[in-house]
Design a protein with these regions (language model features):
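Active-site-adjacent bridging/hinge elements
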Residues: 1-8, 94
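N-terminal ordered "arm"
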Residues: 3, 10-56
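Active-site cofactor/cluster-binding pocket
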Residues: 49-50, 57-106
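Short alpha-helices
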Residues: 83-161
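C-terminal accessory domains and tails appended to enzymatic cores
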Residues: 9, 128-310
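Fold-independent oxyanion-binding glycine-rich loops
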Residues: 20, 44, 61-64, 75, ...
Length: 310
């Protein structure tokens, strides 16, 4: 059972840092209509920024930044969160420190499957676009339709809790199907291809090539009924992190908690109930971080398992 938030947090008005995928781009286009500007891109390892803009002055969108100086908004399953962070799972009481250890697996299967671009509509009280194609773009971002196919009960709970019965009806009746085919055609035309994890085209892009994405973003803005995009900023590497996958257990929770309190944890999320991906500002060493070091080695030896609801 999801616990609806009693009060919604305000969305800070700051330059944006986005994730380098379709959900990040759709989130940017949506917030651009409300006056937001793009200042950076984060690929979960390196933070790219416009010259002269500080990350601490920005809002990270479709990203779960763990550093307390960078406010962020996202929908991933977290272990820790700064006061400046807006996270869908935490708003609805799914991801909390009390869920760690024996309750983690049970909590993880209830994690939020809703893309950030859709989350932003809900958070700001913006009505959904009536056009089913525009809705389909929001659903395609972060593969909500695939999550529904695999984990219908969880997706159903979230969409009903957010008041999105219309999307649920269209998912269950498969009326988005022709629009998904159109989206695949558009993405394929711009050179986006399937990945080993997803059998349909994704929209990952290199942050260093952000300006070259302009033709695609112009088409995407037109498809969504947004204002045309005339330019995109050139961004440069500003902050290089060290990214790891770790086998999760209570000892890892305690060790990462220290990294979080010492401001060394840049971002993190649970990708399985027993696996956490982290980006640290200081690389791990066997001598100073034995618990986390061993958790990385254990994770490398694990067999690949099916991903839980995302």
């Amino acid at each position: 059972m999801l616990s609806s938030p009693k009060q919604l947090p305000p969305l800070p008005f700051r330059p944006l840092i986005i994730h380098n995928d379709l959900d990040g781009l759709l989130s940017y286009l949506f917030l651009r209509e409300k006056g937001y500007e793009l200042a950076g891109v984060y690929d979960l390892e390196t933070l790219y920024m416009k010259p002269g803009v500080r990350p601490a002055d920005c809002l990270a969108v479709d990203l779960d930044i763990s550093h307390p100086l960078i406010p962020s908004i996202g929908h991933h399953f977290l272990l820790f969160s700064a006061e400046s962070h807006i996270n869908m799972n935490m708003l609805f009481g799914v991801s909390t420190p009390e869920n760690v250890s024996e309750r983690m697996k049970r909590a993880f299967v209830s994690k939020c499957p809703v893309p950030t671009a859709l989350f932003l509509h809900w958070l700001t009280g913006t009505p959904l676009p009536a056009d089913p194609l525009r809705q389909a773009w929001l659903v395609y971002a972060d593969s909500l339709h695939e999550s529904y196919r695999k984990y219908a009960p969880n997706v159903t709970r979230w969409l009903l809790a957010m008041g999105y019965g219309e999307i649920l009806h269209r998912l269950s009746s498969d009326t988005y199907a022709p629009h998904f085919r159109h989206i695949v055609d558009v993405l394929s035309r711009f050179g986006f291809s399937p990945t080993t994890q997803k059998p349909f085209p994704q929209c990952r892009f290199s942050p260093s090539r952000l300006p070259s994405l302009l033709p695609f973003l112009q088409v995407l803005a037109r498809e969504m009924g947004f204002r045309s995009v005339d330019n995109l900023p050139a961004v440069q590497p500003r902050l290089q992190g060290a990214r790891y996958s770790l086998r999760f257990h209570p000892g890892v929770f305690e060790a990462l908690g220290r990294k979080f309190r010492e401001w060394e944890l840049l971002s993190h999320s649970l990708v399985y109930h027993d696996q956490v991906e982290v980006t640290l500002l200081v690389p791990l060493s066997e001598q100073s971080d034995p618990v986390l070091w061993n958790a990385v080695r254990t994770c490398l030896s694990l067999p690949k398992t099916e991903k839980s609801p995302a």
